[in-house]
């Protein structure tokens, strides 16, 4: 299905009965065509936090939880966010014999839409803790050049030629939803092993996404691909934690080496 057929940006009725068919898959293949040769584009996970989950237990009593969805980056489809919100709303008045039954139903439906195994972990509403970012924040540096659209020529190696392993992060990631034009805000983590990158050039590159139209997953994959091609690290991880919209936040992570997969976190802006 094409994104133009999705419910994004359209007025919709919120379902009050279980409707798995509201889930809208979007094929990853088209946005990945130019990166097909790059190692790591399909390695990683998309983590979603769902803050508006509710269903009825066997006695008809409402239950609430926070959910973490784990979607493999190798899945043929991602799931459009508004359709996911509508899907979870459709479960609000549905009875389940147990919490496990609820989890299994959601995993079955999301796996069918994604075309791969999707996992759901539930947290009590007070249990999903806020983490502090680890690594070196590059936000106070002064870039040499600023652009308003992604420009891979901004990426440079440090003149020292030093070999390093480092984790950097920036809170300045901003892009736009390609359908609604609404701004998406995020923190991006970059773990890098190889010749030292110029940190100022990395910040300039991240800032260059401010007027870019792209889904969260596509932005992370483009960042990964541009760094991989232009800076040629031995190993690379790119992980973005986006702020919440409509009760959901999306957190894509791509890695060149699966041993570099981080644990999912929730930051203060989420």
From Swiss-Prot:
Gene3D superfamilies: 3.30.1130.10. GO terms for biological process: queuosine biosynthetic process; tRNA modification. GO terms for cellular component: cytoplasm. Pathway: tRNA modification; tRNA-queuosine biosynthesis. NADPH binds at residues 81-82, 245-246. Keywords: Cytoplasm, NADP, Oxidoreductase, Queuosine biosynthesis. SUPFAM superfamilies: Tetrahydrobiopterin biosynthesis enzymes-like (SSF55620). Its main location: cytoplasm. Substrate binds at residues 79-81, 216-217. It comes from the Bacteria. Its EC number is 1.7.1.13. It is found in: Cytoplasm. It catalyses: 7-aminomethyl-7-carbaguanine + 2 NADP(+) = 7-cyano-7-deazaguanine + 2 NADPH + 3 H(+). One of its GO terms (molecular function) is preQ1 synthase activity. InterPro entries: GTP-CH-I_C/QueF, NADPH_dep_7-cyano-7-deazaG_red, QueF, QueF_N, QueF_type2. Catalyzes the NADPH-dependent reduction of 7-cyano-7-deazaguanine (preQ0) to 7-aminomethyl-7-deazaguanine (preQ1). Belongs to the GTP cyclohydrolase I family. QueF type 2 subfamily. This is NADPH-dependent 7-cyano-7-deazaguanine reductase. The gene is queF.
């Amino acid at each position: 299905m094409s994104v133009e057929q999705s419910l994004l940006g359209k007025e919709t009725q919120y379902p009050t009965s279980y409707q798995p068919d509201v889930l809208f898959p979007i094929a990853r293949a088209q946005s990945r065509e130019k990166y097909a040769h790059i190692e790591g584009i399909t390695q990683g996970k998309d983590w979603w936090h769902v803050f508006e989950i509710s269903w009825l237990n066997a006695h008809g009593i409402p239950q609430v939880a926070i959910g973490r969805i784990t979607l493999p980056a190798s899945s043929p489809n991602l799931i459009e966010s508004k359709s996911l919100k509508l899907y979870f709303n459709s479960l609000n008045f549905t009875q389940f014999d147990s919490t496990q039954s609820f989890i299994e139903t959601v995993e079955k439906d999301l796996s069918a839409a994604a075309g791969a195994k999707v996992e759901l972990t539930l947290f009590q509403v007070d249990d999903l803790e806020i983490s502090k970012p680890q690594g070196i924040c590059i936000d106070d540096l002064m870039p040499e050049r600023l652009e308003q659209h992604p420009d891979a020529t901004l990426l440079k190696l440090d003149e020292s030629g030093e070999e390093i392993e480092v984790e950097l992060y920036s809170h300045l990631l901003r892009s736009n939803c390609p359908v609604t034009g609404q701004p998406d805000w995020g923190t991006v983590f970059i773990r890098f092993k190889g010749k030292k990158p110029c940190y100022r050039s990395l910040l300039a590159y991240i800032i260059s996404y401010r007027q870019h139209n792209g889904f969260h997953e596509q932005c992370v994959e483009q960042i990964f691909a541009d760094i991989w091609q232009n800076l040629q690290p031995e190993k690379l991880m790119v992980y973005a934690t986006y702020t919440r919209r409509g009760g959901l936040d999306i957190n894509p992570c791509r890695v060149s080496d699966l041993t570099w997969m981080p644990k999912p976190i929730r930051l203060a802006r989420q």
